[in-house]
């Protein structure tokens, strides 16, 4: 007995020593890097059969979660591009919107111009020179290596409005863009650029048709002026795959979605629609500093209200980031902090919680279910929205408070589980189990501005 115990003790000591050595060795090894998700391995982006959402050729849904980096091509160098795109990837974005040209010509941080002979791009690639389009190539390929699409606003609306690109030049420019980028997997074309579609319509049609005649493999939309939608002018165009509206930087309530989003979803032919420029975080409300600034709560409200009302995606924006503001540049629209500091604002950090929620449920088989909210009579500034599928319903309550819900028309199950999701940190909190035979009231854990909540019934 004594011998056996001695052997076991010795063996145990050797085992502990071996485990300790293995642990020491393992901590000295480099950590396994998380594999980058490359969405286009699922095939090209296409419009879903019912015309409401975007998906890949193999059927995998695509949830557009965009970031706004309008002046990245002009203001960031290669190292800064890498830093910015890494932050975008870590924050959960899978798309970044940029202005390919913000002027005619445009100049980038390296002092290189976008064109040297008008819209004749024949000799644009010069040996030994890292030109404007070489830098654009770098941005696109850098984004691709991180699984990020680039939303290419080909030319901003202002120079077109000023007559700096006509129809003939639009055809030449579209041909150049399409031939250069048709084989890149991570391109989404965006015609327009903060402009009404009835302003130089013939130029926008020429640009779109020129690109589409060469590149039939990438989706295309139109980026409109604030508080307008592409559907007003282009919904019947073959080149327009999905609609985009800009709820803009002045509206503060649900009325803008009723006028633009809900109206677009009723148009024929049916096309997906998304808010490509909602309230930017930290931008002065209606561009006037005396009105205060939009904050993380304003951002979350636009995200959840638009997505739960039937949008196919959402683009976040920040006042300092879109312009890549730093002490090298004069601030626009009263920019305050640098673009690098602003990447970590609260609203930007909240985006990934919504993406994880979408990925945890079968979001794109859902639909708006507003009729499930029975009371109270809602005002547009505190408008709760409902969205759900076969196995779940989501309710977004901007100011918390209480709503009366009736699930009897949604499910045959006698009981459902209710949980709260805190959209500020992604925390899931059990609420209660409840019978579905009749309407019931739910009261959020906290109430008031900045105390928005998502209720899940499943």
Where are the model-predicted features located?
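Residue-level detector of flexible, active-site-proximal loop/helix-junction positions
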Residues: 196, 218, 227, 271-274, ...
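Short beta-strand segments
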Residues: 190-192, 221-224, 244, 274-277, ...
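Aromatic- and carboxylate-lined catalytic core of secreted/periplasmic carbohydrate-active enzymes
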Residues: 60, 272, 281-283, 297-432, ...
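Short strand-edge motifs at loop-to-beta-strand transitions and within beta-strands
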Residues: 440-441
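Catalytic-core region of carbohydrate-active enzymes that cleave or remodel glycosidic bonds
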Residues: 237-325
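Bacterial Sec-dependent N-terminal signal peptides
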Residues: 1-33
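Active-site mouth of glycoside hydrolases
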Residues: 35-254
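Helix C-cap/helix->beta junction micro-motif
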Residues: 27, 146, 214, 268-269, ...
